[in-house]
Amino acid sequence: MTASLHIILDTDPGIDDAAAIAAALFAPQLDLQLITTVAGNVSVEKTTRNALQLLHFWNSDIPLAQGAATPLLRPLRDAAYVHGESGMEGYDFVDHQRQPLAKPAFISIRDVLMNAPEPMTLVAIGPLTNIALLLMHYPECACNIRRLVLMGGSAGRGNFTPNAEFNIAVDPEAAAHVFRSGIEIVMCGLDVTNQAMLSPDFLNKLPALNRTGKMLHSLFNHYRSGSMRTGVRMHDLCAIAWLVRPELFTLQSCFVAVETQGEYTAGTTVVDIEGRLGQPANAQMALDVDGFRQWVAEVFAYAP
């Protein structure tokens, strides 16, 4: 199968990010041209180290650029309490000498976009700081973005505050800028990612697949967003799943705004599904997913 969709992946590994990176690398429908890192689950130094370790594990020469170390206006609030102090607790990766590109992430993204023969798809599975910086410094790049597929937000409950999902809440100003930018957005928020649960039985079959399955199984054993006894939610992997198998998802066009001022609500995505605000739709929000586990089994089988 010939890869038909050229993508750039912005990520903050992160245990479930490791699964998403595997899918982005090995799904035959995708051509991953650049990985960029951002501070989120842990510091950007750690997310960069983790991403480089994964690329070394898979013997991949995909270029990687390090991105923003802090949100646009706020101090970083990370999720080491979920992913462990390193961000990927549970597996001992082999040392390597690889380094990130010299240019920062938002400039590296600009370079790839502007040299591409046609608009490309951006996939963001961490805070949106790098994407906002790209659009702030190089607004002309918007014409070279086919769409942005992101994991973030929620029409209901949050997972970081009562109302806010982690990726949006870490840098709400960046998210607000991105949603106002006019680029096409597909939002895979908690409404759909909480449905993307891998069962204990599924997880325990991973080691028999390949080296990647063994590595992911070891990481999931240390993931504090679920457990091997109750199942694990694959939040970030949903964004890759939509790229490869959009027919598995139900989408709703809607207007999405990001609250940046509220004492208790900063980082909340205000999702106007019923059009009460009278604003034009600026996103397609994923509401439901069906057949997710089967697709995950298929895509992980492509990995070494």
Swiss-Prot record:
Keywords: Glycosidase, Hydrolase. It comes from the Bacteria. GO terms for biological process: purine nucleobase metabolic process; purine nucleoside catabolic process; pyrimidine nucleobase metabolic process. It is an enzyme of class 3 (hydrolase). One of its GO terms (molecular function) is purine nucleosidase activity. InterPro entries: Inosine/uridine_hydrolase_dom, IUNH, Nucleosid_hydro_RihC_nonspecif, Ribo_hydro-like. It holds the Pfam family IU_nuc_hydro. Its EC number is 3.2.-.-. The active site is at H235. One of its GO terms (cellular component) is cytosol. Hydrolyzes both purine and pyrimidine ribonucleosides with a broad-substrate specificity. NCBIfam families: PRK10768.1. This is Non-specific ribonucleoside hydrolase RihC. The gene is rihC.
